[in-house]
Amino acid sequence: LNGVLKLLDTLTTKSVTLDPALVSLIKTQAQQFLATLQPVAPAPTTISNTIIPPAPRTLPLTVLFWEGPIARAYLATLKSMGLKPDKIIHLVSKNDLVTQKPIGRFVPRYFKLAYAHSRQKNSIHYWSSTLQKNENTLYRAMRSTIENGLKFPPSVIDDALALVELSEYSPHIETLMIDNLSDNVLHEYLSKLQQTQILFTGGGIVPTKLLEIPTLKFIHIHPGHLPEVRGADCVLWSNLMMGRTSATCFYMAPGIDDGDVILASYLPPLTPRLHIAQRDIKTLYRATYAFFDPWVRGFVLRQALIETDGFTRISATPQVEATSVTYHFMHAQIQHAVFSKLFADI
């Protein structure tokens, strides 16, 4: 269904003549199907943060920091537990994230890094900042759900949104300017690291050459229960197909969300209280990835840290490929169905 709806959009964009009756039939049938769709199976028992947390300390962990809501949620979560990664590798893009053109070609060399970082930070957090100002009711509804449903204190969320200096989270900060994650500068730097675990925070698809560095293990939090909910927009697909938000902490391997699982879990019920009938789908989608998705991941990161004593006692389990399902970016009509079920109308 997702593919058919996307195909209709593509054909319309290319000005291909379509039978209006057929288009109407497809959209009507899709709407009826989505209205009656039931989750594949009842979600298993959820986890809760009830185990004694690890003692406050510096962890043998390196954070590969790519500025954004996810990275900020991770660092705020670690800090709230009294934990600090041994090192943060701060990745700064040489190129504008929108135009992909080089940044600061005429800026003096000694200003270039700070300028590039400022541009990157402003670009990535644009929607978070804008929605807090222009869609405050929506922001507050999502924030309240995170605070009450996932038990993140207001101070932790405030810390993530403050965008403070990275030195607040780790004693050692290294900064690299790169074109992208395939940049040889990054590969050469990581290849020289002592044996460690890398907490990945985003920035694109991790190239195989990085995952194959023998001294490193990359840890990722995926917003879906692996291997049943793989791919893109899984914070939405998990709600639609499984009836519950979920996430998985795992060791990365080449492939889409491949690798041994450290912790996979369905989360407590999350239902923001807000009337959304007249709200724009794009706004709801942007708010989901600014305020909801990062803390879904942060919740499972927190539990994984608790259950593995700060990633020092890990027993990872291979994924069962027979149960794997890969999802793709969700069409707006399906998004509408998900948001209608996710939000509690008031």
Model-derived regions: residue spans:
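TPR/TPR-like (Sel1-like) alpha-helical repeat modules
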Residues: 5-12
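One-carbon transfer enzymes
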Residues: 9, 19-346
